[in-house]
UniProtKB/Swiss-Prot annotation:
A GO MF label: structural constituent of ribosome
InterPro entries in alphabetical order: Ribosomal_uS11, Ribosomal_uS11_archaeal, Ribosomal_uS11_CS, Ribosomal_uS11_sf
BP terms from Gene Ontology: translation
Role noted for this protein: Located on the platform of the 30S subunit.
Name of this chain's protein: Small ribosomal subunit protein uS11
UniProt keyword RNA-binding, yes or no: yes
Length: 130
C-alpha cells in the first residue's frame, strides 16, 4: 500500500466546556496527535468555541500530513451518560476545518455513550425546582 493511502481515526470529544481532538491509527491503539481547544486559545471561556475547535483541527491536519495520513474516519462524541447527549459547538467546526485542510473524510459516526438504566440523572425525585 502506498504511503499516501494511510487512514486514521479522529476522535472528537465536544462538550460545552472544551473540544478535544485525538487522532489514532485505524485500530485505535496508537495515538498519533492530540489537540484541544484549551491548547490554542488563551482564556478558559473560549475553549469550547468554534474558533478554538477550528484552530485545533488545523494543527491536527498539519501534524497528520507530516505523518503521511491522507484520510480520516471521524467519531464524534458528546458528554453523554447523565450529561447532555448533543455535541458542543466545536464538533461541526472541527469537521469543516478538517475537510477544508484537504483531508479525505470517510465515515462520520456518533459514539456518544447512552445509559441503559444505570444511575439516575441529578435532580432527585421531583426534579430541579427553580
Amino acid at each position: 500500500m502506498a504511503e499516501k493511502d494511510k487512514w486514521g481515526v479522529a476522535h472528537v470529544y465536544s462538550s460545552f466546556n472544551n473540544t478535544i481532538i485525538t487522532v489514532t491509527d485505524i485500530t485505535g491503539a496508537e495515538t498519533i496527535t492530540q489537540w484541544s481547544g484549551g491548547k490554542v486559545v488563551r482564556s478558559d471561556r473560549q475553549e469550547s468555541s468554534p474558533f478554538a475547535a477550528m484552530e485545533a483541527a488545523n494543527r491536527v491536519a498539519d501534524d497528520i500530513k507530516e505523518k503521511g495520513i491522507a484520510g480520516l474516519h471521524i467519531k464524534v462524541r458528546a458528554s453523554g451518560g447523565n450529561g447532555p447527549r448533543t455535541p458542543g459547538p466545536g464538533a461541526q467546526a472541527t469537521i469543516r476545518a478538517l475537510a477544508r485542510a484537504g483531508i479525505k473524510i470517510g465515515k462520520i459516526e456518533d459514539v456518544t455513550p447512552i445509559p441503559h438504566d444505570g444511575t439516575g440523572r441529578p435532580g432527585g425525585k421531583r426534579g430541579r425546582r427553580v
